[in-house]
């Protein structure tokens, strides 16, 4: 099949292989706009300005059918070899290990950035610059990946979660691993041979520690800390089934070896508010109150806060991490801001991100609600993305039913699921973060490709509007999935891969089928350079 049918649409564009222009509507006056396109238009004869195989910047093909390269939490970037270029870190949680003898053990790959990446990186034909192998069959290593300097040497480290890893005969406790970055990073690291620098193992069977994973400096010491989620942990005293928990393990120059959460209490444990919340579905971190330390942004899309009218409305939490070790219970007490979804089954918090999108020097919270129903609730499951601007005066609670946050971005069509993934990055090189939003089940290219998927980029800046309906345009760039069922936007990240001072888009198509459609559901990841 052709590589992903991404699209860069300018104010006047021409169909790929054709010469009839498409005229864009008037851009939204509230959002700075580089280029727009009619988001709901008759199906074109050809997808405007297709990014065909010849025009792709870089595509990474999963090695084998069914690997699920670029799963939902399996994509990020970081400078892992310290050369000044961002590198791609992508997981394949259903890959089968070094000799294909660990079914679904999982793998994670690092592809080094540089001034010119090859247009095609086929993991079946060439090894990644670094490959991590899961320890045992069914571990699902690479279901989550993250980056951060957790040992304080100035170079980003590779982090990968294995949500189904066992610990001492306890099944599916989950684990997270780190391989420390540096100029000599490369080759292979097999968890079965102890070739990782750090292991954090869960404690109770079925907790799924490593389901979510990030790194951030939450205590302000200049070293990133490891934050991992156990989405099915059962809360204080194991009395809240599947409430979920988050553990903070402080980074340091001495961090390494093996940490067992059952024997070595972490710095902080955050407990989900109610049974079934499965905190965190995803998490991010940023300095959301401007105090110089990063707060946690935790998503709980199945939360209802005990209100039957809010069934699965979802919630997101901004958690301030104390210097004092201990626990924080989201069912009571302070130390956090809660954001509650507007309507039942909105799924607020399905994906979250942080970044300074209005340029005031304080990070902002970006929260996806993949099942929200759009403008006036008239587009079922179109999806929404909500923006809460950071501030030293964050309130203790916010309910979207009482009014929107500082900005809301609405999906175009019913069942698009905008906000399934979100990310931020400085795509324009102006020092302000822009917003990226994935809609992996959108019918791309004028609704001609069922579930082809789409990715939108929205310009950040001081004129970021209160509401943006993507059906009216107002976005910078629109990327289209190549074929029906590819689900472009299933994963999403940014990083300055080519070192030009602008972040580039990294997007995954979980169900793409590899070269010539010969590897069903191998998965693909794409690097789309900012221009």
Model-derived features with residue positions:
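C-terminal motif of bacterial Sec signal peptides marking the signal peptidase cleavage site
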Residues: 12-15
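Bacterial signal peptide processing site
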Residues: 17-20
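Blade-edge motifs of beta-propeller repeat domains
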Residues: 34-68, 107-140, 178-208, 245-278, ...
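Beta-propeller blade termini
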Residues: 70-85, 91, 142-155, 210-223, ...
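Hydrophobic beta-strand segments that make up the repeating blades of beta-propeller
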Residues: 88-92, 158-162, 226-230, 296-300, ...
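Short glycine/acidic-enriched loop and turn motifs that connect beta-strands
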Residues: 95-99, 164-169, 233-237, 303-307, ...
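A detector of repeated loop/turn-to-beta-strand junctions in beta-rich toroidal repeat architectures
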Residues: 102-107, 170-175, 240-245, 310-315, ...
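Blade-level signature of beta-propeller repeat domains, shared across WD40, Kelch, NHL, RCC1
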Residues: 455, 490-494, 505-531
């Amino acid at each position: 099949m052709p590589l992903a049918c991404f699209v860069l649409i300018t104010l006047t564009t021409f169909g790929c292989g054709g010469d009839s222009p498409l005229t864009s509507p008037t851009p939204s006056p509230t959002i700075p706009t580089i280029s727009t396109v009619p988001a709901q238009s008759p199906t074109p004869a050809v997808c405007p300005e297709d990014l065909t195989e010849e025009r792709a910047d870089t595509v990474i093909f999963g090695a084998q059918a069914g690997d699920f390269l670029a799963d939902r939490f399996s994509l990020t970037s970081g400078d892992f070899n310290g050369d000044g270029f961002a590198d791609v870190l992508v997981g394949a949680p259903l890959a089968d290990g070094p000799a294909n003898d660990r079914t679904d053990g999982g793998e994670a790959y690092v592809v080094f950035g540089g001034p010119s990446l090859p247009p095609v990186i086929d993991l079946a034909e060439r090894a990644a610059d670094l490959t991590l192998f899961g320890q045992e069959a069914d571990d699902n290593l690479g279901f989550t990946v993250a980056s951060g300097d957790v040992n304080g040497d100035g170079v980003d480290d590779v982090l990968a979660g294995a949500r189904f890893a066992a610990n001492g005969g306890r099944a599916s406790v989950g684990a997270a691993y780190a391989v420390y970055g540096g100029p000599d990073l490369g080759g292979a690291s097999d968890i079965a041979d102890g070739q990782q620098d750090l292991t954090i193992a869960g404690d109770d069977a079925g907790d799924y520690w490593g389901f979510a994973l990030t790194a951030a400096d939450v205590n302000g010491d200049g070293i990133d800390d490891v934050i991992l989620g156990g989405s099915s942990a059962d809360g204080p005293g194991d009395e809240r089934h599947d409430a979920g928990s988050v553990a903070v393990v402080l980074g340091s120059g001495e961090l390494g070896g093996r940490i067992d959460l059952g024997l070595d209490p972490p710095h902080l444990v955050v407990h989900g508010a109610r049974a079934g919340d499965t905190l965190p579905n995803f998490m991010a971190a940023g300095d959301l109150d401007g105090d110089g330390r990063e707060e946690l942004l935790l998503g709980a899309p199945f939360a209802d806060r005990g209100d039957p009218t809010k069934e699965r409305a979802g919630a997101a939490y901004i958690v301030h991490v104390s210097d004092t070790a201990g626990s924080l219970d989201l069912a009571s007490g302070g130390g956090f801001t809660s954001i509650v979804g507007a309507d039942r089954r909105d799924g607020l918090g399905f994906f979250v991100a942080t970044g300074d999108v209005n340029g005031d020097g304080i990070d902002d919270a970006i929260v996806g609600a993949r099942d929200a129903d759009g403008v006036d609730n008239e587009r079922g499951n179109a999806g929404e993305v909500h923006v809460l601007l950071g501030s030293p005066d964050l309130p203790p609670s916010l309910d979207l039913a009482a009014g929107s946050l500082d900005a809301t971005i609405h999906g175009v069509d019913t069942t698009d699921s905008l906000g399934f993934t979100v990310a931020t990055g400085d795509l324009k090189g102006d020092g302000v973060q822009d917003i990226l939003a994935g809609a992996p089940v959108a019918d791309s290219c004028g609704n001609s490709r069922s579930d082809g998927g789409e990715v939108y980029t929205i310009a950040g800046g001081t004129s970021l509007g209160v509401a943006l309906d993507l059906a009216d345009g107002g976005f910078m760039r629109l990327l289209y999935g190549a074929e029906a069922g590819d689900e472009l936007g299933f994963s999403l990240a940014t990083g300055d891969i080519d070192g030009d001072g602008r972040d580039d888009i990294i997007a995954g198509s979980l169900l793409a089928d590899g070269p010539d459609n010969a590897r069903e559901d191998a998965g693909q990841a794409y690097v789309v350079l900012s221009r």
